[in-house]
């Protein structure tokens, strides 16, 4: 399991590479946020229910429906209009999800060569986009109504992108450069 790998191998390795004197200085993954945006299709309750069901299967916990905060006439949406769902994973569920992401989902993704340094936000967090949520084995292909995308945000307590990249490389996430 990745949590045991982190404690036994990754922490000592990063402590040596980054030159930290204290184990608590070593960066760690704080949480993983998953988001499925439906846009205008969110008004269809059938699509919204399938989105919530699929994200619950992927994450292993019940997602929260997200809605529009302000009305925007150009997009033809009103305040309170459902547009997607999200879920935040921490601790054991987070490590279980990351294990499935690294070893199952990313290798199954079409045209995936690796993650780019440009996907970091400057504070040590990375955002990954999955084009088809059917890459996850938990989702039954016969029961889905529409193939949707999935946004994955991995939040770390690293102070910069370099430290976060080293941490994620130790976990086994592939990087292009």
Curated annotation (Swiss-Prot):
Gene Ontology BP, a term: translation
Entry-linked HAMAP family: Ribosomal_uL5_B (MF_01333_B)
Protein family according to the UniProt entry: Belongs to the universal ribosomal protein uL5 family.
Gene3D superfamilies, alphabetized: 3.30.1440.10
One example of the protein's molecular function in GO is:
rRNA binding
For this entry, the protein name equals Large ribosomal subunit protein uL5
The Gene Ontology CC terms held by the record are:
ribonucleoprotein complex; ribosome
Indicate the quaternary assembly.
Answer: Part of the 50S ribosomal subunit; part of the 5S rRNA/L5/L18/L25 subcomplex. Contacts the 5S rRNA and the P site tRNA. Forms a bridge to the 30S subunit in the 70S ribosome.
The entry's keywords: Ribonucleoprotein, Ribosomal protein, RNA-binding, rRNA-binding, tRNA-binding
Q: Which Pfam families match?
A: Ribosomal_L5, Ribosomal_L5_C
Q: What does this protein do?
A: This is one of the proteins that bind and probably mediate the attachment of the 5S RNA into the large ribosomal subunit, where it forms part of the central protuberance. In the 70S ribosome it contacts protein S13 of the 30S subunit (bridge B1b), connecting the 2 subunits; this bridge is implicated in subunit movement. Contacts the P site tRNA; the 5S rRNA and some of its associated proteins might help stabilize positioning of ribosome-bound tRNAs.
